[in-house]
Structures are given as C-alpha cells and as structure tokens.
Amino acid sequence: MILSDRDIRALLAIGDLVVEPLSGDTVRENGLDLRLGRGFCRFKRSDRVLDPRAPGSPGEFYECGEGDEIIVGPGEHMLLHTQEYIRLPGYVAGLVNLRSTWARTGIYIPATVVDAGFEGQLTIEVVGSGFPVKLYPGDRFLHLVLVKLQSPAMNPYRGRYQGQRGVRLPKLFAKNTG
C-alpha cells in the first residue's frame, strides 16, 4: 500500500518515520520530496578495470567534492545525496523517483529501493542528458514514495550504508582498503 500524505504525517507524529530537516513542502500527496545535498562524486573516465575482488582506491575511479552548484555533463555518471536524513520503520520501504521537472531535462536515475529500516541520507546515481544541466543544492530533486509492507521485515536493513551522511562510495572499496 502506498502511503498518502495523511499516513506520512501520522508516522512523523508518532516518531516511526524521521525526516530531518523537515520542510513545509517535503510531505506531498503520496510521498516525500527530498532536496539535493552539496556533495558529489563524478565517475572518472578510465580504461582501468574496477575489480571488486582486488585492492583498490576509490580515488582511481571517482572525483569527489562539494559545491554550491553541480553541473552534470552529457552522459556523465555522478553520485549525489539528499539533504534530508531519513529513518524508515521496519514496516515501510521507499521507492526513489526523480521529480518530473528534472526528468524533463533528460537527467536519469536508475530504479532505487530504500529498504525497510534504513537510516541515513540517500546516495543516488544520476546520469546526464545530451547537454550539461546545472543543479543547485537545496532544490527539490527526488520524490520518495513510501510503501507499507504487509508485515514488518523480519530483518530490517542494518547494512554498511546505515547512518550514511553525504555521498557514500560502493562498499567494495571499504572492504578492500582497510
């Protein structure tokens, strides 16, 4: 069942759902509008193979930083994050969508599920369109549809990305670098 604005406000009121900061326009008819954060990681162009079983450094494949504006180049892949820190209860999952306005610029994001029990800022992959697009931190960028599970998850999310802030690179680097 997709949660309505009324359902979402009820979960916020009892503390089962947390969204920080929570702006007046965050709760929408059937989900949450989330704002773009300042951090980014650009995928570097390289002929080097990223081998998940070999030691490596994320610096070989990503260039990370922060900015007051973020330009996504044509066909460029980037990792971005939300301003909001969220906490989902063990009986709610989320489906991440790009807000329609941004999709109309040609920017694309892959299908992304937020697992029941997840807590943190969302890291999202963005793929550029046929021309550069400038993004501004603080703009409403993603729409998170919340779905109530038929029963609570037996094992809510407790993975490596739990509690993340800013852009989090793939966990395979953490496994191989220390």
Swiss-Prot record:
Amino acids binding dCTP: R99, S100, T101, W102, A103, R104, D115, Y157, Q164
Disulphide bridges: none
InterPro entries given in the database record: dCTP_deaminase (IPR011962), dUTPase-like_sf (IPR036157), dUTPase_trimeric (IPR033704)
Membrane spanning stretches: none
Record's keyword annotation contains Ribonucleoprotein: no
Top class in the EC scheme: hydrolase
A GO molecular-function descriptor: nucleotide binding
KW ATP-binding (keyword) present: no
Coiled-coil positions: none
EC number(s) recorded for this UniProt protein: 3.5.4.13
Signal peptide (from-to): none
Active site as annotated: E125 (proton donor/acceptor)
Keywords: Hydrolase, Nucleotide metabolism, Nucleotide-binding
Enzymatic reactions: dCTP + H2O + H(+) = dUTP + NH4(+)
One of the GO BP terms on file: dUTP biosynthetic process
Pathway where it operates: Pyrimidine metabolism; dUMP biosynthesis; dUMP from dCTP (dUTP route): step 1/2
Task of the protein: Catalyzes the deamination of dCTP to dUTP.
Family: Belongs to the dCTP deaminase family.
Oligomeric and partner information: Homotrimer.
Name by which UniProt lists this protein: dCTP deaminase
Species of origin: Aeropyrum pernix (strain ATCC 700893 / DSM 11879 / JCM 9820 / NBRC 100138 / K1)
Species classification: Archaea, Thermoproteota, Thermoprotei, Desulfurococcales, Desulfurococcaceae
